[in-house]
Design a protein with these regions (language model features):
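Alpha-helical recognition segments enriched in aromatics with Gly/Pro capping
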Residues: 1-107, 111, 125-127, 235, ...
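Charged substrate- and nucleic-acid-binding regions of tRNA-handling and nucleotidyl-transfer enzymes
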Residues: 212-272
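Short, mixed-charge aromatic SLiMs
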Residues: 83-92, 131, 153, 177, ...
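Alpha-helix N-cap and coil->helix boundary residues
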Residues: 75-78, 99, 119, 214, ...
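Near-N-terminal "mature-domain entry" segment
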Residues: 107, 115-118
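Short, surface-exposed helix-loop/turn micro-motifs enriched in polar/charged residues
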Residues: 72-75, 96, 138, 211, ...
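Small-residue-rich helix-loop
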Residues: 117-226
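Amphipathic alpha-helical interaction elements
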Residues: 52, 109-113, 158, 205-208, ...
Length: 273
């Protein structure tokens, strides 16, 4: 319950989204560079942008809080509970504060990395559903699979929407699976790449325990046998099974996709190249 509020020095922002955020502020909010932040200089669409790409509300609140208040000279990351517990008017700053999207991004990154994987799963499912990669209701097996994908992607996931870049190839229907044209032309289409992929397919056929450890060992032996560098095959393999050159580790991708899907996609890549 709000017991006390103070107006900031400049006029209220006209946009309703910003009005609710800034009505209780004290200092003048400025944009990067010169001049006050106002409805005329700050695009209101950006509010929806932060929501739709998957910024954490806690990260945004943490950043906005420190634009007009500070706990001390060194503490930046605060939970909502800590903000409530430590807040006093005596530490409200009087100088104008500048809204810096890059600074907000750093808060988002840190909050994201600290977030429990179960909460990430719950928050990312709606993004996958919006992209029509997951149905409603969500099948029971999706939770554990998505947990493994998130763990494999690690700190590559900066916002909730990033899950679309790192997991679409896990959930897409095989008839809709497609390759990034530039990645395919560079990594799979060259004759030498196609030949190595064809040979490694036969290695995968013989892998009985299709998990990260055995797959890594199989690839290492293949590299030694062929007298090649890991980069000569791993990028080709990644594009063949995921359709793109970025994503979680290639061994995680293979294990999560499963043997049947991997062989099917490699066959498609060989037929397409």
């Amino acid at each position: 319950r709000v017991k006390l509020s103070k107006r900031k020095l400049d006029k209220y922002l006209k946009n309703p989204e910003f009005k609710r955020l800034y009505d209780s502020g004290v200092e003048i909010m400025t944009r990067m560079g010169k001049g006050n932040l106002s409805a005329d200089t700050f695009n209101p669409v950006i509010v929806d942008f932060y929501r739709e790409v998957g910024y954490l509300p806690s990260a945004i609140l943490n950043y906005l809080m420190l634009l007009g208040w500070s706990l001390d000279d060194k503490t930046e990351d605060l939970t909502v509970e800590e903000m409530i517990r430590h807040f006093t008017l005596g530490r409200v700053t009087k100088a104008p504060a500048s809204f810096d999207p890059k600074k907000l991004w750093s808060f988002q990154d840190r909050h994201m990395q600290k977030l429990d994987v179960k909460k990430k799963v719950a928050a990312m499912i709606p993004f996958l559903q919006a992209a029509k990669l997951l149905p409603q209701p969500v099948p029971c097996e999706v939770g554990p699979k998505l947990t493994r994908i998130i763990d494999a992607a690690g700190d590559r996931l900066k916002v909730m929407g990033d899950i679309l870049n790192y997991s679409d190839f896990f959930f897409v229907k095989e008839e809709d699976f497609a390759y990034d044209e530039k990645d395919f032309a560079k990594r799979v289409a060259p004759p030498e790449s196609k030949e190595l992929l064809k040979k490694f397919r036969e290695v995968l056929v013989g892998v009985t325990d299709f998990e990260v450890g055995p797959l890594e060992e199989a690839l290492k032996k293949f590299i030694e046998t062929e007298g090649i560098k890991i980069g000569d095959i791993v990028h080709t393999l990644r594009v063949a099974v995921t359709g793109k050159s970025v994503g979680p580790g290639v061994y995680d991708c293979l294990a999560l996709l499963g043997k049947e899907v991997c062989l099917m996609r490699i066959d498609k890549a060989l037929a397409t190249a």
